[in-house]
A protein has these predicted regions:
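Conserved beta-strand
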Residues: 6-9, 16-26, 33, 57
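Walker A (P-loop) phosphate-binding loop of ABC-type ATPase nucleotide-binding domains
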Residues: 35-40
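Helix-to-loop junction immediately C-terminal to a conserved catalytic motif
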Residues: 49
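Conserved ABC transporter NBD signature motif
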Residues: 57-68, 72-73
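ABC-family P-loop ATPase nucleotide-binding domains
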Residues: 79-138
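Catalytic Walker B motif of ABC-type/P-loop ATPase nucleotide-binding domains
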Residues: 150-154
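ABC transporter nucleotide-binding domain
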Residues: 168-252
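C-terminal coupling/interaction segments
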Residues: 238-280
Length: 280
């Protein structure tokens, strides 16, 4: 079963085009959505959330057409955006009073639990909160209506490394252990090295990589060695190639060929997700 399915989705604006976007987000796993700033990640999330409408294609969320049943489906989604979207004059108590009626399964006890867990004050206005506190408040809201799918758009953006690690630990503890579906967009790749099961890589409005993290990291290898050992035949097997003072470095799906020809002269390593994002 898939929590999200996009089939041949196209969307155009004055400055941006999404071209035949198709991918699936498996239910019960963490899918990392990566790409440079401006690649189109936020646009796709807004399409999924029915904030934008595609020119062509179909978007299904929790096995239903999002365009046909947006209100009910949004009740089943916990979402976190990078910017604060709450009225900053409100206190957390006032915030709950305003938003609870919109969620059929809103749980006051769960919300109170997370306010206490995250050490968020009840009677202070949101404008007094730090960036990290505002993000925790967004998570508390997302966690408090028994969602089945969580969509996070750059949840660690603007946080210092300590706060980022704390946030990732919260996501791991609260959601992964309960086998929830998480679709997490980020350009901070180290965030996904820890928690992602699947990776979707978007570049210039197109999906260029899609699969389980384990399979993708097994499929590609980073090779490096002396430039004089890199002949035209081997160079043709490189998806990415860079020359440095110390030699060449590249990405390939044919590491075994390099090993057979160059032997101990070539260094072969497993790439990181960040390597794949940079090299592909």
């Amino acid at each position: 079963m898939n929590a999200i399915e996009l089939s041949n989705v196209n969307y155009s604006s004055d400055q941006f085009n999404l071209k035949n976007i198709s991918f699936k987000v498996p239910q019960g796993f963490v899918t990392g959505f990566i790409g440079r700033n401006g690649a189109g990640k936020t646009t796709i999330i807004r399409l999924i959330m029915d904030l934008y409408q595609p020119q062509t294609g179909v978007i299904r969320v929790l096995e239903e057409d999002m365009a046909l049943n947006p209100i009910e489906l949004k009740n089943r989604i916990g979402f976190v955006y990078p910017e604060n979207y709450f009225n900053e004059r409100w206190t957390t108590k006032q915030l709950e009073k305003m938003i609870a009626p919109f969620y059929r399964k809103w749980d006051h006890q769960v919300f109170e639990f997370y306010l206490e867990k995250f050490d968020l004050p009840i009677n202070k206005s949101i404008k007094t909160f730090s960036t990290g506190m505002k993000m925790k408040l967004s998570l508390a809201v997302a966690f408090s209506h028994h969602a089945e799918l969580y969509i996070f758009d750059e949840p660690t953006s603007g946080l210092d490394p300590l706060a980022r690690n704390e946030l990732l630990e919260i996501i791991q503890q609260e959601l992964i252990d309960e086998n929830k579906t998480i679709f997490m967009s980020t350009h901070i790749i180290s965030d996904l090295e820890k928690i992602a099961d699947y990776i979707i890589h978007l570049s210039d409005g197109e999906v260029i990589l899609n699969g389980s993290k384990e399979q993708l990291l097994q499929r590609y290898q980073v090779v490096s060695g002396a430039i004089e050992d890199l002949d035209d035949e081997l160079a043709s097997l490189l998806i990415y190639e860079e020359h440095k003072r110390t030699g060449f470095i590249g990405l390939t799906e044919h590491a075994q060929v390099f090993k057979e020809i160059l032997g101990h002269k070539v260094n072969i390593t497993t790439p990181s997700i960040e390597n794949l994002m940079v090299y592909l």
